[in-house]
Amino acid sequence: MLNLLIKLTLSVAILFYNFSVNAACMKEGDKVVLSGVMKEELFYGPPNWGEERQHDEKLFYWILHLNSPLKCVNDANTERDGWDSNVQLIVSSEDYKTKRNLLNHHITVDGNVMLAVTGYHMTSVLLKDISFKPIE
C-alpha cells in the first residue's frame, strides 16, 4: 500500500511540474514585449531558395536579434539554428517607410507571437501586429 501511495505521489508531482513548465512557455498568439537590435537581412526565395542565388528572388526582412534568448515557445521549430535569438518582424508597409531609421539600433517592440509556417518565414518565431515602443 505504501508503495502505491509513493508512486501516486510521484506521478502527481511530475504532472504538476509538466504543467508549470508549459505555463511559462510562450505560445502562438501570446502578446509579448521583446528587445534587441533590428537589422534588415537578405534571404533568397523562389524558385530555388538560395541554391541558385543569381536566379532566386531576393527577399529583405527585418530581423530582431534579441537581447535575451527565448526560453520556451510551444510548438516552435527548435532545431533551426538561432531559433531562440532571432525573430522575424511582420512589419506594416507604413512602418517599413517610417521606421527605417531604427534599423541597426536597439529597439523594443510588442506584438503577437507567430510560428513559422511557410518558406517566407525565415525564423522559427515571428512577431506580428507589432508596435514600436519609445526608446528609454
Please state what every model-predicted region is:
Residues N22-D30:
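Cleaved targeting-peptide boundary
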Residues L66, V117-E136:
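OB-fold/S1-family single-stranded nucleic acid-binding modules
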Residues N74-T98:
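Beta-strand/loop nucleic-acid-binding surfaces
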Residues E94-V109:
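Short nucleic-acid-contacting surface segments enriched for D/E, G, S/T with interspersed K/R
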